[in-house]
UniProtKB/Swiss-Prot annotation:
The keyword Ribosomal protein applies. GO terms for molecular function: structural constituent of ribosome. InterPro entries: Ribosomal_bL17, Ribosomal_bL17_CS, Ribosomal_bL17_sf. The lineage of its organism: Bacteria, Bacillati, Bacillota, Clostridia, Eubacteriales. It comes from Clostridium kluyveri (strain ATCC 8527 / DSM 555 / NBRC 12016 / NCIMB 10680 / K1). This is Large ribosomal subunit protein bL17. GO terms for cellular component: cytosolic large ribosomal subunit.
């Protein structure tokens, strides 16, 4: 059975939040978020990139079922995936930027390598 972090949210809210995080990440190439959210988003984003590397119609439809914007999917298949054609995983980099001012949660920047 697949394991996942609960992130203190109901399952539908967690899924929606992760879809939005991954979509924003693939759109901008970089996002700032908390460590645990970044770890979950990183895993899903890497799966999307690996699917996009296949490049077939079924892979495109699978990515479209998760990523919320069609333009992002188009960019993923035409620009991002070919860039990582020779790389087997490890498409992202995560580095800490210190605690958030309001609640002290540890923040990271997640970016494409």
């Amino acid at each position: 059975m697949a394991q996942h972090r609960k992130l203190g949210l109901p399952s539908d809210h967690r899924r929606a939040m992760l879809r939005n995080l991954v979509t924003s990440f693939l759109k901008h190439g970089k996002i700032q978020t908390t460590v645990t959210r970044a770890k979950e988003a990183r895993s899903l984003a890497e799966k999307m990139i690996t699917l996009a590397k296949r490049g077939d119609l079924h892979a495109r439809r699978q990515v479209l079922s998760f990523v919320t914007e069609e333009e992002v999917v188009k960019n993923l298949f035409t620009n991002i995936a070919p860039k990582y054609a020779e790389r087997n995983g490890g498409y992202t980099r995560m580095y800490k930027i210190g605690p958030r001012r309001g609640d002290g949660a540890e923040l990271v920047i997640l970016e494409l390598v």
